[in-house]
C-alpha cells in the first residue's frame, strides 16, 4: 500500500477547503523512499549534490548570475504529441518569431523548427533543431537554449545527442493517448543522461482528453512520482484556461494568439477539485522531499514558496516531475510552462558534468562552468550547411571566442574557430564569444560527433552519447552515373548520423546502407534525390541477423603452411562458449601458462577473433554473445608469426562454432499500434498473422493501443497492411527489443540461401 493512499482518509469540507492534516503515527511507520524511489539512487544524488556545491564555491558572482539566468532545455515526446507546435508557441510568446505557423506547412510556411522541406511535407521532425530565446519573469530576463527533437523512433539518435548536452527537458504528453511507446523510450533516454523534466500534458482541447489518466500513467508506466500543479478550466472544446494549484489562481489566455495572460479568482465549481489536487501535490512531495516530509509530520501547511522550493529540489533530484497542462494549438497554458522552466529546471551550475583527464590515467574531473577556467566543449552534432560543415558545440567550461585555436583531444589536431554562431533553426546569428553553459555552432572544424575540444592547456575527454545498433539494411545503387555525388551524400550522412551506416559488399558488389528502420532509410534516399540530384534504386529491406552458439565446444587447431623458405605455423587450444550476460557482448580471453604463446601472438589471436566475429560461419552475419578462451598452444621457432596465429584463431573459431549447436538470432521488435476502437479486431488479426505475441491492450475513449513483440522479418510492408485494415486511421511504432533464435525452418532456409550464393561465386 502506498503512503499516499494511506493518507487519503475521508475529510470534512471546511469553507470549501480541505484542511491540511494527517495521521503522523501511520506515516512515520513506513519508509517513504521505498514507495517512490528516485530513478537515480538517493545516495548517488546526495553525493552528486555535495560535488555540485563544491563546484559552486569556485564560481565568481558574475558566473553565478550568468548561470542563474540560463536554461538548456529540450522538448521531447512521442510522435504527434505536439512538440513542434508547442515549441512554435514558445518562440512566439518569447518574441523570437513574429507569427505562428503550423506543422505540415499548411500555411505554405511551416513550423519554424521544421526547416527541411521533408519535415514540413510529412509533418514530422527529422533532425533536432536548436534555437534560443529570452523570457521575462518577475522583472528578470532568462535565456533559453532550446532543442526540439524528433518523436519517431527511427530518429532516436537525435534525441540521444540532444539530451547528452541538455540540463533539463519538457516532456510533452498527449492528453488523449497518455504515455505511449516513444514516451517510455524518451523517459529511458532522460534517465540515461540524468536529465530532470517538467511534464506538459498537451491537446487538452481534444475530445477524450483526460489529464489525470495521463498523470496516473506517468506514475505507473514511467515509475516517476508525478503530480499536477494545475487543473483545467473547462474540458475538450470548452477549455478556457488553467488553475494554478500552488497560488490558487485561475489563468486565462487572451488576445488573438493567447499572448495576453489574465489572472483571476478560481471558479467556485472548481475549488473542491483544486483543494483535492493541491493536497495530493503536497502528499506526493512529502513522499520524495525531506523538508516537505518534516512539515507533513508536524502537520504544518506549507507556504506557496515552500511548495515551489520542494518542487525544484525534487525535480532537480530527478525524483519527481511537476505536471502542467494546456493546448499548444489552442494557445492555452504555454506561458506557465516557461515560468516552470525557470522555477523548477536546473541552471548549468546545478548540474554535475564530468570529464576524464587523458593526461592523468583518465582520472575523473568535475567541470566548473566558469569563464576563467580552461575551455572544454563537446561537439554533439554535425550538419552540412551552405558554408561547409556546421559543428554544434556545448561549452561546459571556460569560454569559446571567435579566432581562438582549440584542440581536438581525440586527434590532437589544433583548429581555428573562424566563425561562431547561435542557431535559430536554419538561421544563424554571428557572435564573438560564448560562455560556459551555452550552446553554439562553428564552421570549418573537421571532427566527429562526440569529440571533445579544449584550449590545449588540459587534456579532458567527455563521454559520448549512446548509439544503438542498426536493425534494417538495404542495397542501394545510383541510377545515374554520378558516383561522385552519391559518395559525397553517403559520407555526409554518415558523419551527421552515427546510426546511419554504409558498407560495400565485395561479394554482391553492392553498397549496403543500414539504419534504425524503413522510414529512417527512406528519408536518406529521398534526401539524396533532393539535395544531391541522385536517383537511387533500392533493394528489398534486409534484416540484420546475428549468429550465436548454445553449448561450449573445445578446439585444438594447428595452422601449417610450407611454400619454400619460412612457412607459417600456429597452434591454439581452448574453448568456445556462449556468454550468459548479454550486456557483455563478445569476449576474448587468454590463460596461457609458461609463455607457450608469446604476447605479440596472443594480440594477433585477439585481432583474428574480432575479425571472424564480423562475419559468422553460418550466413555471414555478425556473431553475438560468444566467448573464446585460448589456454594453450604451440609455436615454431622459425615459422611462427602474427599472421599464423591470427589465421589459426579464425579457423579454430569457425570449426568450433559449427560444433557448438549454432543458432541464427533475429531482431525482435516492440510494436505499438494505435487505432480507432472499431478496428481492434482487424489489428489483432493482422498481428496474429505475423505471429506476434500480444503483451498488452489499452482501450481509451475512442481509440485503443495494442503492444506486442514481433520478429522484424515479418514487419516489412506492415504500414501498408495496417492502412488497409484501419482505413488509413491506424498508426504504429517499432523499437528494437532484443535478439532471439529464429525458428528451425527459417534458420534452415537462411543457411541454404547463403550456401547457394556462395556456390555461384
Swiss-Prot record:
CDD domains, A to Z: EF-G (cd01886), EFG_III (cd16262), EFG_mtEFG1_IV (cd01434), mtEFG1_C (cd04097), mtEFG1_II_like (cd04091)
The highest taxon in the source lineage is Eukaryota
Cross-referenced InterPro entries: EFG_II (IPR041095), EFG_III (IPR009022), EFG_III/V (IPR035647), EFG_IV (IPR047872), EFG_V (IPR035649), EFG_V-like (IPR000640), EFTu-like_2 (IPR004161), G_TR_CS (IPR031157)
PTM comment text? The precursor is processed in two steps involving mitochondrial intermediate peptidase (MIP) and mitochondrial processing peptidase (MPP).
In its UniProt record, which GO terms are filed under biological process?
mitochondrial translational elongation
Entry's localization field: Mitochondrion
Q: Which residues are the transit peptide here?
A: 1-42
Domain tr-type G stretches: 68-349
List, alphabetically, the Pfam families matched: EFG_C (PF00679), EFG_III (PF14492), EFG_IV (PF03764), GTP_EFTU (PF00009), GTP_EFTU_D2 (PF03144)
Q: Where are the transmembrane segments?
A: none
GO cellular component terms?
Answer: mitochondrion
Q: Which PANTHER family match?
A: ELONGATION FACTOR G, MITOCHONDRIAL
Give the similarity note. Belongs to the TRAFAC class translation factor GTPase superfamily. Classic translation factor GTPase family. EF-G/EF-2 subfamily.
> What's the protein name?
Elongation factor G, mitochondrial
Species source reads: Saccharomyces cerevisiae (strain YJM789) (Baker's yeast)
Amino acid at each position: 500500500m502506498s503512503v499516499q493512499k494511506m493518507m487519503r482518509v475521508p475529510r470534512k469540507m471546511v469553507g470549501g477547503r480541505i484542511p491540511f492534516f494527517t495521521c503522523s503515527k501511520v506515516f512515520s511507520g513506513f519508509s517513504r523512499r521505498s514507495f517512490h524511489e528516485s530513478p537515480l539512487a538517493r545516495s548517488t544524488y546526495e553525493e552528486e549534490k555535495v560535488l555540485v556545491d563544491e563546484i559552486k564555491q569556485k564560481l565568481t558572482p558574475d558566473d553565478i548570475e550568468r548561470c542563474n539566468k540560463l536554461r538548456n532545455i529540450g522538448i521531447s515526446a512521442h510522435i504527434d504529441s505536439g512538440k513542434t507546435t508547442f515549441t512554435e508557441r514558445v518562440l512566439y510568446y518569447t518574441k523570437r518569431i513574429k507569427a505562428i505557423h503550423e506543422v505540415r506547412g499548411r500555411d505554405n510556411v511551416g513550423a519554424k523548427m521544421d526547416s527541411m522541406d521533408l519535415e514540413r511535407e510529412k509533418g514530422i521532425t527529422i533532425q533536432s533543431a536548436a534555437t534560443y530565446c529570452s523570457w521575462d519573469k518577475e522583472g528578470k530576463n532568462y535565456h533559453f537554449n532550446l532543442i526540439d527533437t524528433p518523436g519517431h523512433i527511427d530518429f532516436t539518435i537525435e534525441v540521444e545527442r540532444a539530451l547528452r548536452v541538455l540540463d533539463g527537458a519538457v516532456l510533452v504528453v498527449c492528453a488523449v493517448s497518455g504515455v505511449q511507446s516513444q514516451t517510455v523510450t524518451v523517459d529511458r533516454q532522460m534517465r540515461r543522461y540524468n536529465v530532470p523534466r517538467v511534464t506538459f500534458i498537451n491537446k487538452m482541447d481534444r475530445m477524450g482528453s483526460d489529464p489525470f489518466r495521463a498523470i496516473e500513467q506517468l506514475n505507473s508506466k514511467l515509475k516517476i512520482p508525478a503530480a499536477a500543479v494545475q487543473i483545467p478550466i473547462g474540458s475538450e472544446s470548452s477549455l478556457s484556461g488553467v488553475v494554478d494549484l500552488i497560488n490558487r489562481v485561475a489563468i486565462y489566455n487572451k488576445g488573438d494568439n493567447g499572448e495576453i495572460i489574465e489572472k483571476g479568482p478560481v471558479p467556485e465549481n472548481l475549488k473542491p477539485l483544486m483543494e483535492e489536487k493541491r493536497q495530493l501535490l503536497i502528499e506526493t512531495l512529502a513522499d520524495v522531499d525531506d523538508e516537505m516530509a518534516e512539515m507533513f509530520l508536524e502537520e504544518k501547511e506549507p507556504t506557496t514558496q515552500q511548495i515551489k522550493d520542494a518542487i525544484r529540489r525534487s525535480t532537480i533530484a530527478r525524483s519527481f516531475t511537476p505536471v502542467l497542462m494546456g493546448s499548444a494549438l489552442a494557445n492555452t497554458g504555454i506561458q506557465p510552462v516557461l515560468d516552470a522552466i525557470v522555477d523548477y529546471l536546473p541552471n548549468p551550475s546545478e548540474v554535475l558534468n564530468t570529464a576524464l583527464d587523458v593526461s592523468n590515467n583518465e582520472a575523473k574531473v568535475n567541470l566548473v562552468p566558469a569563464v576563467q577556467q580552461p575551455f572544454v566543449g563537446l561537439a554533439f552534432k554535425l550538419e552540412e550547411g551552405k558554408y561547409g560543415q556546421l559543428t554544434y558545440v556545448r561549452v561546459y567550461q571556460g569560454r569559446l571566442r571567435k579566432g581562438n585555436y582549440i584542440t581536438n583531444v581525440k586527434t590532437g589536431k589544433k583548429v581555428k574557430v573562424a566563425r561562431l554562431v547561435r542557431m535559430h533553426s536554419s538561421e544563424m546569428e554571428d557572435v564573438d564569444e560564448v560562455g560556459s553553459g551555452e550552446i553554439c555552432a562553428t564552421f570549418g572544424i573537421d571532427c566527429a560527433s562526440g569529440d571533445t575540444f579544449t584550449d590545449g592547456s588540459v587534456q579532458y575527454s567527455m563521454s559520448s552519447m549512446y548509439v544503438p545498433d542498426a536493425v534494417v539494411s538495404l542495397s542501394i545503387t545510383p541510377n545515374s552515373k554520378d558516383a561522385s555525388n552519391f559518395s559525397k551524400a553517403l559520407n555526409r550522412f554518415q558523419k551527421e548520423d552515427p546510426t546511419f551506416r554504409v558498407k560495400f559488399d565485395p561479394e554482391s558488389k553492392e553498397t549496403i546502407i543500414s539504419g534504425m528502420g524503413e522510414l529512417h532509410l527512406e528519408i536518406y534516399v529521398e534526401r539524396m534525390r533532393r539535395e544531391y540530384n541522385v536517383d537511387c534504386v533500392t533493394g528489398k529491406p534486409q534484416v540484420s541477423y546475428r549468429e550465436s552458439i548454445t553449448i561450449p565446444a573445445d578446439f585444438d587447431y594447428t595452422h601449417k603452411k610450407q611454400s619454400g623458405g619460412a612457412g607459417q605455423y600456429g597452434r591454439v587450444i581452448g574453448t568456445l562458449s556462449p556468454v550468459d550476460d548479454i550486456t557483455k557482448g563478445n569476449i576474448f580471453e587468454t590463460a596461457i601458462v609458461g609463455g607457450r604463446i608469446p604476447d605479440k601472438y596472443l594480440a594477433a589471436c585477439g585481432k583474428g577473433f574480432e575479425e571472424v566475429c564480423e562475419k559468422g560461419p553460418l550466413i555471414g552475419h555478425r556473431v553475438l554473445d560468444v566467448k573464446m578462451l585460448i589456454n594453450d598452444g604451440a609455436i615454431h621457432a622459425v615459422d611462427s608469426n602474427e599472421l599464423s596465429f591470427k589465421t589459426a584463431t579464425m579457423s579454430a573459431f569457425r570449426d568450433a562454432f559449427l560444433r557448438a549447436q549454432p543458432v541464427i538470432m533475429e531482431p525482435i521488435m516492440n510494436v505499438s499500434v494505435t487505432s480507432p476502437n472499431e478496428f481492434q479486431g482487424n489489428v489483432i488479426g493482422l498481428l496474429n498473422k505475423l505471429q506476434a505475441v500480444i503483451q498488452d491492450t489499452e482501450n481509451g475513449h475512442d481509440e485503443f493501443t495494442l503492444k506486442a513483440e514481433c520478429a522484424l522479418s515479418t514487419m516489412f510492408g506492415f504500414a501498408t497492411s495496417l492502412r488497409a485494415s484501419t482505413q488509413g486511421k491506424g498508426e504504429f511504432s517499432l523499437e528494437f527489443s532484443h535478439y532471439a533464435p529464429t525458428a528451425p525452418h527459417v534458420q534452415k532456409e537462411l543457411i541454404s540461401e547463403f550456401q547457394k550464393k556462395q556456390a555461384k561465386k
